[in-house]
UniProtKB/Swiss-Prot annotation:
Signal sequence annotation: 1-22
Annotated Pfam families: 7tm_2 (PF00002), HRM (PF02793)
Keywords carried by this UniProt record: Cell membrane, Disulfide bond, G-protein coupled receptor, Glycoprotein, Membrane, Receptor, Signal, Transducer, Transmembrane, Transmembrane helix
Gene for this chain: CALCR
Residue intervals on the Cytoplasmic side: 170-181, 243-259, 321-340, 395-474
Compartments, record wording: Cell membrane
Residues linked to a glycan: 28, 73, 125, 130
Single GO biological process annotation from the record: cell surface receptor signaling pathway
Family membership: Belongs to the G-protein coupled receptor 2 family.
Protein name as annotated: Calcitonin receptor
């Protein structure tokens, strides 16, 4: 199962600017007047020759036509094979994939007239099949391509924005610091870098047909880093699963682990399949800018990614089993805390891996296919946003810490720049904050007899509410 939806969107947008012309007035026995990029043209020609060989073999194996009345003989039209067709019938097949801008969901038609003769184009009086819809970029297709293009840009831009905020939160609030947050920050960084690379590719490479034709090394280097960062995304998620599994199942709630092995797995291991893919791609499928997805070499990268997703999912299932057992036996609060962390990871594993499972079953219906495309592009391009939302913004500990800091800031701001609140106001603020479960600090200032210092801040201090409550009870 190929992780190819993103690159198909890129290729479609590029090819909208450089379609392979199919002249309705020309015979299908000739190749397009303007060739696609050289390497893909060679691949397409091999596919064409293979289809021709299979067609002639099929025509020899099929029995003679058994119908009544005139009919058109089986034939090879130069691009596709056509069986015996009754007179007056319009035959059709799906477009071939010889050329990168041909849409396999569109149809080729060939008409057998009433006399049993294949239709001939009036321009040159040669047998003609209608391939015009294969690369006919209608306004609807153009609009769809632009929508997917800008959806990708918006998704990755939003991902970068939310991930940077999340990193800032984890950096500023040291009380959130722990080993698992360190894993979060590394995973966030991979998504930020990956989104930046994709945006560069979308803005600088995809619309630039001349750059793709020149095929500079920098274009392929950019693709290499995209594949590397994409792999890092999933292997850092595997690190999250391994960490929780070791913490809960293996080490029995051990507090510290050696993170160097996680760095090696998250940053180091993805280099292996990515480097192997780059070498084999350069040798066996060296297309321009490595934009084509019509190669099984992509499994070199996507195979380990899929394996990481499967292993991670089984890790998390085992973690849930252990936690449920412990909660039934001991009702430990710590188990509940870890279970929340596991739930967040379990949500992300199928969410971020769904394209590997669902992609092969794209509906053939145009409307359903379009819905599928929008859904899959949303899941793929907004991955960073989902990661930041689930791991940071929806995290109860993060929310509590931010709320606590905000309440402290407002109280200190009011005391420094605003009027001193009455005792009733302070008590009401403390009570409302305490009801929300937020540890609150109040501003306490000893009264002074010296009018000159009545508005000063000397002698003021921030006193936790629990200290005041202890003194009151005493």
């Amino acid at each position: 199962m190929k992780f190819t939806l993103t690159w198909r969107c890129f290729a479609l947008f590029l090819l909208l600017h450089q379609p392979t012309p199919v002249n309705p007035a020309s015979s299908n026995d000739t190749h397009p007047t303007v060739e696609p990029e050289p390497f893909l043209y060679v691949i397409g020609r091999k596919k064409l020759m293979d289809a021709q060989y299979k067609c002639y073999d099929r025509m020899e194996q099929l029995p003679p036509y058994q119908g009544e009345g005139p009919y058109c003989n089986r034939t090879w039209d130069g691009w596709m094979c056509w069986d015996d067709t009754p007179a007056g019938v319009l035959g059709f097949q799906y477009c071939p994939d010889y050329f990168p801008d041909f849409d396999p969901t569109e149809k080729v038609t060939k008409y057998c007239d009433e006399t049993g003769v294949w239709f001939k184009h009036p321009g040159n009086n040669q047998t003609w099949s209608n391939y015009t819809m294969c690369n006919a970029f209608t306004p609807e297709k153009l609009q769809n391509a632009y929508v997917l293009y800008y959806l990708a840009i918006v998704g990755h831009s939003l991902s970068i924005f939310t991930l940077v905020i999340s990193l800032g939160i984890f950096k500023c609030f040291r009380s959130l610091g722990c080993q698992r947050v360190t894993l979060h920050k590394n995973m966030f960084l991979t998504y930020i870098l990956n989104s930046m690379i994709i945006i560069i590719h979308l803005v600088e490479v995809v619309p630039n047909g001349e750059l793709v034709r020149r095929d500079p090394v920098s274009c392929k280097v950019l693709h290499f880093f995209h594949q590397y960062m994409m792999s890092c995304n999933y292997f850092w998620m595997l690190c999250e699963g391994i960490y929780l599994h070791t913490l809960i199942v293996v080490a029995v709630f051990a507090k510290q682990q050696h993170l160097r092995w996680y760095y090696l797995l998250g940053w180091g291991f993805p280099l292996v399949p990515t480097t192997i893919h780059a070498i084999t791609r350069a040798i066996y499928f060296n297309d321009n800018c490595w934009m084509s997805v019509e190669t099984h070499l992509l499994y070199i990268i996507h195979g380990p990614v899929m394996a990481a997703l499967v292993v991670n999912f089984f890790f998390l299932l085992n973690i849930v089993r252990v936690l449920v057992t412990k909660m039934r036996e001991t009702l430990e609060a710590e188990s509940h805390m870890y279970l929340k962390a596991v739930k967040a990871t379990m949500i992300l594993v199928p969410l971020l891996g769904i394209q590997f499972v669902v992609f092969p079953w794209r509906p053939s219906n145009k409307i359903l296919g379009k819905i599928y495309d929008y859904l899959m592009h949303s899941l793929i391009h907004f991955q960073g946003f989902f990661v930041a939302t689930i791991y940071c913004f929806c995290n109860n500990e993060v929310q509590t810490t931010v709320k606590r800091q905000w309440v402290q800031f407002k109280i200190q701001w009011n005391q420094r720049w605003g009027r001193r609140p009455a005792h009733r106001s302070v008590s009401r603020t403390a009570a409302s904050a305490e009801e929300g479960g937020i540890p609150v600090y109040i501003y306490h200032q000893e009264p002074r007899n010296d009018p000159a210092h009545s508005l000063g801040e000397e002698g003021a201090e921030i006193i936790p509410l629990n200290i005041i409550e202890q003194e009151s009870s005493a």
